[in-house]
């Protein structure tokens, strides 16, 4: 355990001579108490850096979400479909075939009235 703590301190400080000095049992005990304090301080420092990194990633996600919202608001295809529907409604209202049939029916009624009037005279 003492060697592991000494190696952790050596790795964080970048000093290989500290690991070799920790092999002696007399210096390992005081070094262990100081290493736990330094390791705890360094882990707190790294945790703060991790929080900063996560904040940057959330900002990037927010920018990507904004881009997606712009794409959703640009869609104009439903408006085009509505215009096409309006054109179909105009075609349906233009039909005058029933009016022509009514005029033809009126002509038939007139011809029917003439023969009825002729025998009565």
Swiss-Prot record:
Keyword Signal included in the entry's annotation: yes
Record's keyword annotation contains Lyase: no
Similarity comment: Belongs to the Asr family.
Name of the featured protein: Acid shock protein 2
Protein localization: Periplasm
Modifications after synthesis and translation: Proteolytic processing gives rise to the active protein.
Prodomain positions: 22-63
Primary site of residence: periplasm
Stretches with biased composition (Low complexity): 94-103
Compositionally biased tracts (Basic residues): 84-93, 104-113
Pfam families: Asr
Cellular component, GO annotation: periplasmic space
UniProt entry keywords in alphabetical sequence: Periplasm, Signal
Signal peptide range in chain numbering: 1-21
Location of region: Disordered: 40-121
Organism of provenance: Yersinia pestis
Function: Required for growth and/or survival at acidic conditions.
């Amino acid at each position: 355990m003492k060697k592991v703590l000494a190696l952790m301190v050596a790795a964080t400080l970048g000093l290989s001579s500290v690991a070799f000095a920790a092999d002696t049992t007399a210096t390992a005990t005081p070094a262990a108490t100081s290493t736990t304090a330094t390791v705890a301080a360094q882990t707190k420092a790294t945790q703060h850096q991790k929080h900063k990194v996560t904040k940057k990633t959330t900002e990037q996600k927010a920018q990507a979400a904004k881009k997606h919202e712009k794409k959703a608001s640009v869609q104009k295809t439903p408006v085009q479909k509505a215009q096409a529907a309006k054109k179909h409604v105009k075609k349906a209202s233009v039909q005058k075939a029933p009016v022509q049939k009514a005029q033809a029916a009126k002509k038939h009624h007139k011809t029917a009235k003439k023969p009825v009037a002729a025998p009565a005279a």
